[in-house]
Amino acid sequence: MDSFYRYGETTPILSGEMHYARIPHQYWRHRLQMMKGMGLNTVATYVFWNLHEVEPGKWDFSGDKNLAEYIRIVGEEVMMVILRPGPYVCAEWEFGGYPWWLQNIPGMEIRRDNTEFLKYTKKYIDRLYQEVGPLQCTKGGPIIMVQCENEFGSYVSQRKDISFEEHRSYNAKIKGQLADAGFTVPLFTSDGSWLFEGGCVAGALPTANGESDIANLKKVVNQYHGGKGPYMVAEFYPGWLSHWGEPFPQVSASEIARQTEAYLQNDVSFNFYMVHGGTNFGFTSGANYDKKRDIQPDLTSYDYDAPISEAGWITPKYDSIRSVIQKYVKYPIPTPPAPIPVIEISSIKLERVVDALLLAQSIQPVNASTPLTFEQLNQGYGYVLYTRHFNQPISGILEIPGLRDYAVVYVDGEKIGVLNRNTRTYSMEIDIPFNATLQILVENMGRINYGSEIVYNTKGIISPVTVAGKEITGGWNMYRLPMDKCPVLTEFGDNVCRN
């Protein structure tokens, strides 16, 4: 069998990746109708574990997090769903979808055959099934496929310190947890075609990411799937991700249209990653690791140069793809919906402003002899203000090699300079006078979401701070500034800056 079938009929999967959490729920239906108007019949989405389990055992599937409602709307629009629950998702998403607090659990080692880790992945998968299990096509819903893990072959190639046997055991156990939870639709894996050996798992269809060579695609799928298909490119990239300080990547519409036609001519199903990127709201954007830059934070924008722009507008790429698809599909392609009207917002005057140093004065600090990480402070995101008072003057080179990730340095409220992991700037000259306070405001710019460095993802100041080669110990105060809610500025009285 070299094709996908539904209700006994050959049904090629023409899918687009669109993540519920990156789009306000009020726009979900409009964007899905845009996908239909492009000629697609399926939507793929990751599930973000850390979005839903914000604290151990505390679950949230409301509002923009209402995955089940998103899937129901897909069904109402007569489309199919490919669910990609991870538990690891990459996705340029904070920590690859893992909850930050996993790092606080004794004995925890993520993404491997570790008892503690698998205990928590099982809880996640079982809870997810409660939300979406009834929406499988085997129960009359739109979910047609579920992915096991995610690009695990890449991780196997990067973590050669872990035995191949353990990697295989872990991958099989994640598949087993999905099945045990009650997922009965076909399972699949997705990897680069040269990484199938590490990423494939028995009983799941192997699919390739970014594979443009159709002959090679069929060859490797046949090799790992009993000499048969169906054949699918689970991530077909019409654009690419964006990092801070780097040019916006662009892929030509004509190039994508040509490749789309090649897939359609050769009975290859595909999933555009992304068809509509949306926005990394709040502190959800992730980062890559790079030896030259140490960290490459992702942007708040997840436009991805996708066929549907971040704002939800049709692009030339959208039109090019639509023109190709309509030549090959048997079903009618509807007219794309009208764009959502753009409103004009008048100027907004900020009349009450409070800076972070003043805000910290309203917060009870945590005291320690050395700086504590975000995780030790039981904080996932935002900022931490580290302060240390000096009774004697000191000057020289301030060094914070364990900075994660960006710091503004003050002495008695006066800005001295900036340290930045992204530019590998970990030191600066400093002069701290008698009876002065060193203040270091540290920002978490997003936990690494890809590669072997994902296991080193604590934030804040994670190693000793030195001045003139001397470690500064004793008397550290940490002020937690998660920025998860707006401060009540009236509480600051006359100290609030007024414009």
Residue ranges and their predicted role:
Residues R22, W49-L51, V89, F152, ...:
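Feature marks short, surface-exposed loop/turn motifs that line or immediately flank catalytic pockets
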Residues R72, L83, P87-Y120, D126-F272:
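Substrate-binding/catalytic cleft of secreted carbohydrate-active enzymes
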Residues M1-Y27, Q33-T42, G229-Y231, L481, ...:
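An acidic-aromatic substrate-binding cleft motif
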Residues W28-G96, W100-W101, K175-D180:
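Aromatic-lined substrate-binding rim segments of carbohydrate-active enzymes
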Residues H19-G37, P56-I73, S169-Y170, S254, ...:
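Aromatic- and glycine-enriched glycan-recognition loops and surfaces
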Residues E9-T11, Y46-K58, G63, A91-E116, ...:
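Aromatic- and acidic-residue-enriched carbohydrate-binding clefts of CAZyme catalytic domains
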Residues L118-V132, K139-Q147, G153-S154, Q158, ...:
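Carbohydrate-binding surfaces of carbohydrate-active enzymes
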